[in-house]
Amino acid sequence: MSDIVVVFHSGYGHTQRIAQAVAEGAGAQLLAIDADGNLPPGGWELLAAADAIVMGAPTYMGGASWQFKKFADASSKVWYTQGWKDKLFAGFTNSAAMNGDKLATLTYLWHLAMQHSGQWISLGLMPSNDKAAKRDSINYVGGYGGLLTTSPSDASPAEMAKGDLETAFAFGERIAQVAAKG
């Protein structure tokens, strides 16, 4: 079994709920970036030992949260030594609007993985894009490069769409399958 770590920031609990579903599907460890943009003790060592790093951030104002960006900037010490070279990476984001410019955040996560000379794992699921599709369908938001989820601004984390949570779990399973291939 591969060591997979889901590192994420969540401002209101929605991105955390997605992170938990991805981690459950992947059999991964969760690593939360705190409200000040810091990892807990041992966090950098956990990432160094991982075979795959899954990154998650909410989309705020067209990009990742500042707390996630602080973590990303701090990873430049790892970049300098190419400590994450050839690791597997994947990413996810959540926003209140259906589009919400989530692709900008996902692209940011991809760029960060590329800076670290990593290999990216796509979502690997077809979108639910026919007339029969419902909000609780798998990959209703229609991501390809990574997981995109939507939480209405007045919805609590407990009210998240079942389809988004199931898509997150399936994404985690895919990450574990790719990581197992070595």
Model regions and ranges:
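N-terminal beta1-alpha1-beta2 submodule of the flavodoxin-like/Rossmannoid cofactor-binding fold
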Residues: 1-84, 153-182
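Gly/Ser/Thr-rich helix-start
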Residues: 12-14, 57, 63, 101, ...
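Generic structural "secondary-structure junction" signal
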Residues: 62-63, 86, 94, 123, ...
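Short, glycine-/small-residue-rich phosphate/pyrophosphate-handling segment
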Residues: 88-139
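Glycine-rich phosphate-binding loop at the start of an alpha helix
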Residues: 107, 143, 162
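Short glycine/proline-rich, acidic loop/turn segments that cap or connect secondary-structure elements
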Residues: 134-151
